[in-house]
Structures are given as C-alpha cells and as structure tokens.
Amino acid sequence: SGSGKSITCKSILNLVNKKFNVSGEIIFQGRDLLKLSQEEIRKVRGKDISMVLQNPMTSFNPLYTIENQMIETFLEHMDISREKALEISKEALEKMSLKNIEKILKKYPHELSGGMLQRIMIGIAIILKPKLIIADEPTTAIDSINQKDIIEEFILLKKNLNVSILFVSHDLGILSHIADNLIVMKEGKIVESGTTEEIIYNFKHEHTKFLIETKRALMGKFKKVKK
C-alpha cells in the first residue's frame, strides 16, 4: 500500500488527476503514450490496452444496465452494428462461463457481485483482444473463492490469447502463480526486479524480504488454525 503501483498503472493510460505531473516515457508498440493527444489515447484504451480495476464497481456506470454498457464499449472500438454488439456481449459472458446471461445483461452493476463484475470486465477484454491487460489488484475486493477463479481466468488469458498482463498485487502468493517476472516497488520506486523465481527464492532487498516473510507468517498461522 502506498508504493505507487496504482498510480503507475493509471499513468500508462493517462487516467491520473490533471494536478499530477507525469514525466518520462511510456513506450507501447513504438509510441510514447505520454505524447499522444486525448483523442489518440482514448483509442488506445480498451482496444490496445485494457484495464481491470481493483474495485470492479468503479468501472461501470451505476445508471445503465450491463447490456447497455457492454454494447456501447464494443461500438466504440469495433465497426459493427448494435445487433452485432449485443451478440458479442452475450458471447463475452459465455466465455466467462456465466449462467442466466439474459438476466445478467438486464441487471445494473449494483445488482451483481464483485466477482461477477470482474468476469464481465475480463470477458470484454477477451473480445477486444488487447495487446496488454493492466490488472490493478483485481482480486482484492472479492472473496477467496472468486479470487481463485479470477486468477485462473487470467492464466487462461495469457495462455490462449498470447496477451501480456501487467498484474498488480501485494500478494506474492498470487503473483507466484501468474507472473513470469516481478517488479517490487516501495514509495514510488522500483527496488527490485527479476524473474519470479529469482525474486521469491533469491531476493536482495529488505522490502522484498519483508513482503515474503509476512506472507509466510500469515500462511503459517492459517495452517495452525486449519489444524
């Protein structure tokens, strides 16, 4: 918490408050995203780079149904009719193994669980086939059962769509299952980076040590309670 993970993710898509001064370079497919106009970066969002947020409720407009929001998203990024957009919306939910699709589409965001909203966001990303998915602590706001399912969805995404995923989490246990490489941040700076195996088994920075030992201590207490 407070290490700068989320603000870094938002900076990539120019979603930070205008009061923030963002400098440097963010190179994506040969282009510096910081130099793009608002119109150009808007076209990158969703189609080329999708973002799955920590609290899925903030990704949806509470005044519109899921159907309306999915259709508008696909119309924005794809040259298709409204009827085709509805068909694709149903396809996206089917890919997430969601049941009662017709009912889900007619629901408002507050009528669905956090885990279900996360699946809808991932389903939208699958249809748009972005080059990069930024997942900003997508398992934090949902229960442990849904966490496992969401992690599996991301693993399948990486495998089946050959998409790059920037997965943000404070839980090294989760990251050990999904990440090929790790970056450890503290107070807005990168303090350590390397392959997942290198970071977990041969860490060098004290902050990395703290994160790993904290996770191991929690797991030890959990096992004692379980017994």
Annotate each PLM feature.
Residues 201-227:
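C-terminal boundary and immediately downstream tail of ABC-type ATPase nucleotide-binding domains
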Residues 175-177:
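A short, surface-exposed alpha-helical micro-motif characterized by mixed small hydrophobic
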Residues 107-112, 116:
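Conserved ABC ATPase signature
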Residues 21-32:
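Conserved ABC transporter NBD signature motif
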